[in-house]
Amino acid sequence: MTEQVRVAITGGSGRMGRTLIEAAKQNELILLGAAIERAGSTLMGVDAGELAGVGAMNVAITDSLDKAVDDFDVLIDFTSPEASVVHTDWCARNGKAIVIGTTGFNHAQKEQISAYGDQIPIVMAPNMAVGVNLMWKLLEVAAEVMGDYCDIEIIEGHHRYKKDAPSGTALKMGEVIAETLGRDLEKCAVYGREGITGERDRGTIGFATVRAGDIVGEHTALFADIGERLEITHKASSRMTFANGAMRAATWLVEQDAGLYDMQQVLGLKGITI
């Protein structure tokens, strides 16, 4: 690829939005074409680079994708489930690819976005960090070797501002393990415990959630048997790891046909056996 990929970023003034703007500035393969914020924001017209603390980028914050329709090829969206569905619909109507890092979707919203994959290229992933996507491969191996003989728990922690729980990454961890073991996560997941719960059912996958301070993201899968336990952990120390993954996804996505893709495909991990 010789030409830069032009991207637009929604939620440009938020914590993740500003990190995405910074990542775009640092990536030689990316050109920031637009930064979108909610209508009525006091930040309209502010230079996106100045807002992100990386110096002027000559891209003013705007409140409409329509105003920026000619300025980008890939939309990068880390907003809310409701907003992401609206943004994906807009992309489908305007022939734009989209990278979605939003989490907290319900089943119907996931189905809506999946349907748009018939019209445009979409990367949708609950976590775009390279290490997390490698962790999912490791979980397949651990589940295959140990899953039927031990207790499985998933523990995740995030900052106090995160709105959904468990995190999309934690749920994906559970899905990977359950699928490897031939289980249905909707039937075997246990979300938190309280009171007299009785003896643990080995066929379940437990989830525990921490929300505190400024934790960027920590995820651990615990495979515990009598006499030993295996812990597979990923800790993110900066949102930049997610932002860099999104930029990588954008540069990959412009070369793809319409379809719904994930970061495993972006990173070439599909079909790899560890």
UniProtKB/Swiss-Prot annotation:
PROSITE patterns: DAPB (PS01298). NAD(+) binds at residues 11-16, 37, 101-103, 125-128. (S)-2,3,4,5-tetrahydrodipicolinate binds at residues 159, 168-169. The keyword Cytoplasm applies. It is found in: Cytoplasm. Its main location: cytoplasm. Coiled coil: none annotated. Its EC number is 1.17.1.8. Transmembrane segments: none annotated. One of its GO terms (cellular component) is cytosol. It comes from the Bacteria. GO terms for biological process: diaminopimelate biosynthetic process; lysine biosynthetic process via diaminopimelate. It catalyses: (S)-2,3,4,5-tetrahydrodipicolinate + NAD(+) + H2O = (2S,4S)-4-hydroxy-2,3,4,5-tetrahydrodipicolinate + NADH + H(+); (S)-2,3,4,5-tetrahydrodipicolinate + NADP(+) + H2O = (2S,4S)-4-hydroxy-2,3,4,5-tetrahydrodipicolinate + NADPH + H(+). NADP(+) binds at residue 38. GO terms for molecular function: 4-hydroxy-tetrahydrodipicolinate reductase; NAD binding; NADP binding; oxidoreductase activity, acting on CH or CH2 groups, NAD or NADP as acceptor. Pathway: Amino-acid biosynthesis; L-lysine biosynthesis via DAP pathway; (S)-tetrahydrodipicolinate from L-aspartate: step 4/4. The active site is at residues 158, 162. It holds the Pfam family DapB_N. Keywords: Amino-acid biosynthesis, Cytoplasm, Diaminopimelate biosynthesis, Lysine biosynthesis, NAD, NADP, Oxidoreductase. Catalyzes the conversion of 4-hydroxy-tetrahydrodipicolinate (HTPA) to tetrahydrodipicolinate. Belongs to the DapB family. NCBIfam families: dapB. This is 4-hydroxy-tetrahydrodipicolinate reductase.
